Amino acid sequence: MEQLKQQLQAAGILYKENEPLSAHCTFRIGGPADLFVMPRDEDQLCQTVQFCKQAEIRYYLLGNGSNILFADEGFRGAVIDVSAEAAGMGLSIYQNADGDYISAPAGLKLSELCKFALQHGYTGLEFAYGIPGTVGGAVYMNAGAYGGEMKDVLEAVSYLTADGRWVDSEASELDFSYRHSAFEENDACILGAVFHLEKGDPDAIKARMNELMQKRIDKQPLDKPSAGSTFKRPAGAFAAVPPWRCRRKRQALRFCGEPGRCHLCRCAGFV
C-alpha cells in the first residue's frame, strides 16, 4: 500500500485514507476504504489503475454508488472514484455524414447527460432521465427504463483493458442485451461513451422527461436510502409479484410490515 501511495503522490493524484464508503453510496452504509482515490481526468484514472496493478492492490471502480451495497467492514484496497474524473472533462457534440453525436465521460451523472441533450435539442435519452448513477455504470449494465435502453442510443465506448490498452469499440461489438454488456465478463475500465441522437422538439423532450420523473417520484422511495431497482424484470413478466400470487404471502407481508405499502410489492424491486 505504501508503494501505491507514493506513486499517487508523485503523480499528483488525490486520495484519502480510511474514507467511509457510506458517504459514497445511495444506501448510506458501508465501512472505510483503505484508500479512496480521486483522479481528475482520464490520464489520472488510467495511471491509478496501472499503479494498483503494479502494486498488486485490489481496486474497485466507483461511480455514483447507486448500484452497490458496501460491507460494514469496508474495502481492503483502493476504491477509485470515477465521478471525480468527470469533473475534469466536458461533454462535446460532433457531427458527420451519419448524424449527430454526444461524447460523455464515464464518471458523468446520467441525469446531467440527459439535461445536456435537452439543452441542445436532442431526443433519445428521455428514458434515462432520473436513472441514478453515471454514464459508465449505465453502459456497464445497459441500464434502461420505460421502453428504452442504453444500447438503443449508444454508438461507441472507450475503455482501458485489463492489460492497460486503450480501446475504442463500437457498441455492436460489446454484446449488449437486457441489463448486460461484455464489460460484466472482463476487467475493463470504461472511460467514456459516444451517443448517436436525433434532433427533436425541446418542449416535447422536456415534457417526456418530466412525465417519467413524476412516475419515479410517485412509485419510488427517492427520499430514502436505496439502491434503486434491485431486481431484473423476467421476460414477459414483472420483477414485483403481488402478495396474493406469492406462495410466501405471509413472509412478504411480514417483511413489509404494512400490507399494501411495501415497495417490493409495488414496483420493480425498490427496497
Which residues does each predicted region cover?
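Alpha-helical scaffold segments in soluble metabolic enzymes
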Residues: Q3, Q47, E112-F116, A156, ...
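Thr-Gly-centered strand-to-loop micro-motif
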Residues: A104, N142, S226-A227
